[in-house]
Amino acid sequence: MNHLDLFSGIGGFSLGLEKVGFKTIAFCEREEYCRMLLQKHWKGVKIYNDIKKLEGKDIKEPVDILTGGFPCQPYSVAGKQKGTNDDRYLWPEMFRVIKEVKPTFIIAENVRGLINIQDGMVFETVCSDLESEGFEIQTFIIPAAGVGAPHKRERVWIVGYSKHNGSLTSKIKRRYNEVDAGTQK
């Protein structure tokens, strides 16, 4: 299954997904040091450096899962919390790429401040944007300490499945029934 990694950093999403059988087909990361690390670990995988210039037609293979930890500075309590008025507010660019490549799954990650900034309207925009494109979404808040980190910073996770591919629930039930009946293929 193919993975497109936006706002890649040093490739955490790709590393995790690689361990369960996904193939990263492209990265988008602007920081030079991160791009150097990505290039070293994922030799031959295309690295785009500007989300604003990345177009869906640039991605030649189908995308099964698209991930992205879009910039958190507009929402972080450590920053000025300018929300949509911050130059680093790049959700609209990530959403544009989602619409263009039409992945089956998306996973987005950000700081907890995303939920509250501008009276919750930014978080609502992210969720309603995805739903308007036919995604069933679930949101989670997971503290970093919950997965073994030595701090408890809470992260917001948004997981979506494209309803254009049929109901995820029915696929899970069908798969479970195949396994249960001993007919797993």
Language-model segments: which ranges?
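Conserved acidic E/D residue at the C-terminus of a beta-strand in Rossmann-like folds
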Residues: 28-30, 109-110
